[in-house]
Swiss-Prot record:
Involved in the degradation of the LPS-assembly protein LptD. Degrades LptD that have engaged the Bam complex but are stalled at an early step in the outer membrane protein assembly process. Residues 242-254 have a biased composition (Basic and acidic residues). It is a lipid-anchor. It comes from the Bacteria. The keyword Cell inner membrane applies. Binds 1 zinc ion per subunit. It is an enzyme of class 3 (hydrolase). Its EC number is 3.4.-.-. The active site is at residue 135. This is Metalloprotease YcaL.
Length: 254
């Protein structure tokens, strides 16, 4: 019933817009497309979104060089993963390193956490713990799930895919790759980024890990501002502000 009402509302809005095409600068086709995207995202179940994340992550892994567990990167990440834990709010977490000079790290709704060797070359283990704690925050707080649904909706609208149960099995490798890329390149709001920062701080404290690494990670990333173009925090709030927020939390003991 909820889905029927939602679709009816979108259809009604679309009909009204069609009658006043391009009025007041509104692009009717874009508005209708946005409405359909919203509907597709709203009707995709959490289970299906995580199933898509499972396959999307596998597709990303197949397209990247993954560091072996015996490599220096694999050994470092194993130590970091042990410190952070392999479960976040009931979601199993798996960690891997991509061998690339890009500076990035991300997590999907299914607990798939990936960090790039370019980032590990720039930071010590404690700083990487802070960064990955932030990415785990997006998973725990539902941000990653919402972005997976939104990314699916865009591809589903483009390729006319229905949001039926078990939709993950209908997707091609190309579609899975597009959805995964859209989800991991999502531009979160300032509030969501701040929430993930605070989650990381709290997680580090809970796990007995130094929170100073979170400050250090922001300071390192701040040095990239205006420099290297492919940085994981290109779309995030200024790193200097975030570092100061964590310093304030450390000073207050809260």
């Amino acid at each position: 019933m909820k889905n029927t009402k939602l679709l009816l509302a979108i259809a009604t809005s679309a009909a009204l817009l069609t009658g006043c095409q391009n009025t007041h600068g509104i692009d009717t086709n874009m508005a209708i497309s946005s409405g359909l995207n919203a509907y597709k995202a709203a009707t995709l179940s959490d289970a299906d979104a995580k199933a898509i994340a499972n396959q999307g992550c596998a597709e990303m892994d197949s397209g990247n060089q993954v560091a072996s567990k015996s490599s220096k990167y694999g050994k470092r990440l194993a130590k970091i993963a042990k410190a952070l834990g392999n479960n976040i709010n009931g979601t199993p977490v798996n960690y891997k390193v991509y061998m690339t000079s890009d500076v990035n790290a991300w997590a999907m709704a299914n607990g798939c956490v990936r960090v790039y060797s370019g980032l590990m070359d720039m930071m010590n283990d404690n700083e990487i713990e802070g960064v990955l704690g932030h990415e785990l925050g997006h998973v725990a707080l539902g941000h990653s799930l919402a972005e997976m649904k939104a990314s699916y909706a865009i591809v589903a609208a483009r390729d006319a895919i229905s949001a039926t149960s078990g939709v993950a099995s209908q997707l091609s490798r190309s579609q899975l790759g597009d959805i995964a890329e859209g989800a991991i390149n999502a531009k979160y709001s300032r509030d969501k980024e701040s929430e993930a920062d605070d989650f990381s701080f709290d997680l580090l404290k809970k796990r007995g890990i130094s929170t100073q690494g979170l400050v250090g990670s922001f300071e390192t990333l701040a040095s990239l501002d205006g420099g290297r173009t492919q940085s994981m925090f290109d779309s995030h709030p200024p790193s200097t502000e975030r570092a100061q927020h964590i310093r304030d939390r450390i000073a207050s003991g809260k």
